[in-house]
């Protein structure tokens, strides 16, 4: 991995793999945290491993464009964390990681450490044959995972979904499953269309390893997966992207353009880093 090149492409607006640098990554010696906060005076990592504010960890400014980073030793998977950001006006914000790969279940809002290096795939045959299917008919079954079937008061997990959905798809002649957004979101009623975590698999139905298993089983059955994405707007919740470092960053700087008709914030697509953030998110889910 060429860290410097990825960061350069991130700032230029055409990165497809910014997630390889940003976020929380298990590396030799601990977990490397990297976040983009150009307007911040200081950034700390806080979480279950620091007893939150008691032992906060100050991050280092990596470049003049506002990338902050720190490697923290001796951390465990599934620990929770946030970024504590001091703005230019001296205010303190607590923000979830924009590049988090997993998050707490609502109403909690912290990011969670997860080691994606542990994901294993057995779908080589599917990937090899995929290019042979471009000129074949498609029959797509779209579903909202939270509403397809219920297990009492709870939605199906990814494992339960695979057990019942795959036979149903095969029996009815569908070739692909289109899943409504699976990126983390705080409001159940949005069905995932008001996103807070663009790299974070929603924790409602299971963890990344369990989703990995679901996709593997679908591919083994010859079923393709399509994931819906929402690269237009994001939630206004205080823990999220809105005024991430105390000033407009992911959203437009003026209120008229920033506010959408859905009560959310519009992404500022003129911003190079925002474009890289969204394009890398799409590539992350595919990869």
Where are these regions (language model features)?
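The feature marks proteins involved in alpha-glucan
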Residues: 1-32, 62-142, 147-155, 160
């Amino acid at each position: 991995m060429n860290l410097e090149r990825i960061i350069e492409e991130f700032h230029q607006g055409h990165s497809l793999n910014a997630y390889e640098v940003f976020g929380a990554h298990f590396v030799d010696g601990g977990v490397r945290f990297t976040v983009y906060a150009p307007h911040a005076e200081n950034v700390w990592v806080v979480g279950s491993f620091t007893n939150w504010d008691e032992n906060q960890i100050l991050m280092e400014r990596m470049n003049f464009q506002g990338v902050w980073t720190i490697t923290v030793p001796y951390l465990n998977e599934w620990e929770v964390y946030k970024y504590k950001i001091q703005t230019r006006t001296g205010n303190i914000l607590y923000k979830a990681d924009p590049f988090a790969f997993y998050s707490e279940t609502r109403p909690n809002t912290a990011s969670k450490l997860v080691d994606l290096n542990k994901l294993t795939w057995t779908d080589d045959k599917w990937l090899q044959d995929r290019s042979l299917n471009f000129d074949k008919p498609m029959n797509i079954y779209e579903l909202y995972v939270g509403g397809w079937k219920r297990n009492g008061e709870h939605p199906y997990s990814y494992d339960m979904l695979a057990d019942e959905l795959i036979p149903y798809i095969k029996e009815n002649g569908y070739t692909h499953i289109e899943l409504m957004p699976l990126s983390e979101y705080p409001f159940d009623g949005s069905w995932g269309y008001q996103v807070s975590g663009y790299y974070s698999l929603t924790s409602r139905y299971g963890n990344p390893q369990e989703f990995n298993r679901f996709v593997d089983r679908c591919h083994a059955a010859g079923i393709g997966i399509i994931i819906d994405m929402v690269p237009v707007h994001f939630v206004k919740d205080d823990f999220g992207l809105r005024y991430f470092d105390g000033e407009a960053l992911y959203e437009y700087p003026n209120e008229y353009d920033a506010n959408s008709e859905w009560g959310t914030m519009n992404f500022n697509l003129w911003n190079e880093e925002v474009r890289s953030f969204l394009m890398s998110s799409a590539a992350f889910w595919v990869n």
